[in-house]
Amino acid sequence: MELKHVLMIIGIIILTIAPLVMYSGLTEEDGYFGGADGAASDLIMELSPEYEPWFEPFWEPPSGEIESLLFALQAAIGAIIIGYFFGYNKAKYDFESKN
């Protein structure tokens, strides 16, 4: 196995384990993988308690699992679209370089 492949695998392992080690022992109240939405709403209420939202969502998912599923589905669709365009451009470049 080439050195660049070994270094890439080591880098992936470090990037996978580092967040888990850095946040081990923290709970969600301490900011363990907390969301930006919750932090933003807390800050808004702290700065301006009389603030009222402009609108309410027309539909809320029935559970947190459904919300996570929809988020993962959105991420997967985005990854497919981005991957398609990278593959299309790579194939186009390869085709043009052969001709």
UniProtKB/Swiss-Prot annotation:
It is found in: Cell membrane. GO terms for cellular component: plasma membrane. Pfam families: CbiN. It is a multi-pass membrane protein. The keyword Protease does not apply. One of its GO terms (molecular function) is cobalt ion transmembrane transporter activity. GO terms for biological process: cobalamin biosynthetic process. Forms an energy-coupling factor (ECF) transporter complex composed of an ATP-binding protein (A component, CbiO), a transmembrane protein (T component, CbiQ) and 2 possible substrate-capture proteins (S components, CbiM and CbiN) of unknown stoichimetry. PANTHER family: COBALT TRANSPORT PROTEIN CBIN. Part of the energy-coupling factor (ECF) transporter complex CbiMNOQ involved in cobalt import. Belongs to the CbiN family. HAMAP family: CbiN (MF_00330). This is Cobalt transport protein CbiN. The lineage of its organism: Archaea, Methanobacteriati, Methanobacteriota, Methanomada group, Methanococci.
